[in-house]
Amino acid sequence: MDASTKTTKKGAGGRKGGGPRKKSVTRSIRAGLQFPVGRIGRYLKKGRYAQRVGTGAPVYLAAVLEYLAAEVLELAGNAARDNKKNRIIPRHLLLAVRNDEELGKLLAGVTIAHGGVLPNINPILLPKKTERANTGGKEPKTTKAGKSPKKA
């Protein structure tokens, strides 16, 4: 056979040329994930965590990472809304993580840059409630002499 009778096109990637190319379906799309399964698989192989990496491992890891990211972002978005802000900043991330029991335990040893600290006042330092109880539950009225109350 001479070169003129070949039907394969150059750059066809090892497949027979001619027809329209089928749209590629990534493993992330197959798994219904936003996180990149292929990239995570590459990192697992390149990192030499094990001699061999199964086909399901990067899918599972991508799903776990996506879930954790969604959880943290949801709580941080709520913290931003509580502070009347539209943009999530590191402070909101810190408040979200530290106020959630399970995430706080997971990220106990993690320092979030520019996150600040949780607001916390020791109960001993707070004013005592017994002062108010001695007056019968009512605050003493203080009126200034010479001033009449405002009329509506």
Curated annotation (Swiss-Prot):
Subcellular location: Nucleus; Chromosome
Gene Ontology cellular-component terms listed: nucleosome; nucleus
CDD domains: HFD_H2A
SUPFAM superfamilies in alphabetical order: Histone-fold
PANTHER family hit by this protein: HISTONE H2A (PTHR23430)
Its job: Core component of nucleosome. Nucleosomes wrap and compact DNA into chromatin, limiting DNA accessibility to the cellular machineries which require DNA as a template. Histones thereby play a central role in transcription regulation, DNA repair, DNA replication and chromosomal stability. DNA accessibility is regulated via a complex set of post-translational modifications of histones, also called histone code, and nucleosome remodeling.
Family note: Belongs to the histone H2A family.
Protein name: Probable histone H2A.3
